[in-house]
Amino acid sequence: MKAVVYAGTRNLYPHMVMAMKSLLINSPVDKIYLIIEDDEFPFPVPDCIETIRVDPYLFFDPHSPNMGIQFTPFALIRAATAKLLPDDLDRVLQLDVDTIVEDSLNELWEMDLTGKYFAAVPEYLGKFKPYGPIYFNCGVMMLNLNEIRKTGIETDLIKFLNTEYVPYGDQDAWNKLGIDKAAIMPVRFNEAFCTGYTENPAIVHYAGRIDWASNPSVYRAKYLQKYRGAGWP
């Protein structure tokens, strides 16, 4: 089954709608899971979209060092994705809400992730590589849920984020603890200012620039004009 998961707080719900529309228009999937803080999603959505209500403090102490970071608590919750999704789901594509899908993602479900926790695109911009020679951007991740559950690494990720401050939430946890079992994803599946640019991006990632209305990038027009007024396929 082709499944995708997004996570976010209430202020991000409108961006989730745009992200999901772009996904279903350009690369239809069987199921979309929304990890959110409400019982129901407040916008009309297709039947393939299922909400999972999660208390932001389910896995993380409100006084943990990462609760005051620049991102919402759901940037930590994503470290526990494998604990929240159905046990019979063997892999899932985890997407940030500030992503727009522009082309088919079928290649990602065909990736061989045997023995790997995830596949993602490395960052190339800057010298921020605190955990080794490579640093992955985790805004687009194909998660191998079978391997994650088998090893129990999600428990280690949660413990790490509850005890050690990191600037980028679950992304730092994965780069610290899971990098030895990571596969490299082609850059066209996570085109961002920190990963690189291609002529035919499949996923455009704003990478934190969530104020799209004031973002002067060329991709702002795609969001505003193409998906804001688009209907569900």
Task: Name each region found by the language model.
Residues 2-12, 62-67:
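Glycine-rich phosphate-binding "P-loop"
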Residues 118-135, 216-220, 230-233:
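A short, conserved beta-to-alpha structural element at the edge of catalytic cores
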Residues 53, 74-125, 133-135, 141-143:
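GT-A fold catalytic core of metal-dependent nucleotide-sugar glycosyltransferases
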Residues 41-84:
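Active-site-proximal specificity loops/subdomain of glycosyltransferases
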Residues 32-37, 120:
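Short internal beta-strands
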Residues 1-8, 18, 138, 143-233:
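A glycosyltransferase accessory/donor-loop signature
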Residues 36-41, 124, 188-191:
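Short, polar loop motifs at secondary-structure junctions
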Residues 22-29:
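Short, acidic, metal-binding catalytic loop of nucleotide-sugar glycosyltransferases
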